[in-house]
């Protein structure tokens, strides 16, 4: 019975970590998210090893199934938030690339680099 309680606690820890990761992503605390991800991966790996040994009862299996569904829902939400961030970064990289093209093309005609959208002084 103690092993089954430990297994449930392990799943609850994973769920808690995934919820914290979502909160960090929503507040754009990306560095903290990356740090927490290491703890999350470690918890998942140790729980996976422990799950094979425990042999949970039917009642516990149902609890674990519900907890696992919550974890998977969190994974989906986190993936969506990370995709949003990746799209933002792609846009910033695209702007930077366009800025570099403008500067290299037109910068040779002026003593200073041009910024996109900046009025030109003649």
Swiss-Prot record:
Q: Give the start-end ranges of region Required for homodimerization.
A: 1-50
Q: What is its main location?
A: cytoplasm
Q: Name one GO cellular component term.
A: cytosol
Query: What's any GO biological process attached to this entry?
Result: bacterial-type flagellum organization
Localization per Swiss-Prot or TrEMBL? Cytoplasm, Cytosol
Chain intervals for the UniProt region annotation (FliD binding): 60-98
Q: Which UniProt keywords apply?
A: Bacterial flagellum biogenesis, Chaperone, Cytoplasm, Repressor, Transcription, Transcription regulation
Family indicated by similarity = Belongs to the FliT family.
Q: What does this protein do?
A: Dual-function protein that regulates the transcription of class 2 flagellar operons and that also acts as an export chaperone for the filament-capping protein FliD. As a transcriptional regulator, acts as an anti-FlhDC factor; it directly binds FlhC, thus inhibiting the binding of the FlhC/FlhD complex to class 2 promoters, resulting in decreased expression of class 2 flagellar operons. As a chaperone, effects FliD transition to the membrane by preventing its premature polymerization, and by directing it to the export apparatus.
On assembly, the entry states: Homodimer. Interacts with FliD and FlhC.
Q: What is this protein called?
A: Flagellar protein FliT
Which species? Serratia proteamaculans (strain 568)
Biological classification of the source: Bacteria, Pseudomonadati, Pseudomonadota, Gammaproteobacteria, Enterobacterales
- Give me the gene this protein comes from: fliT
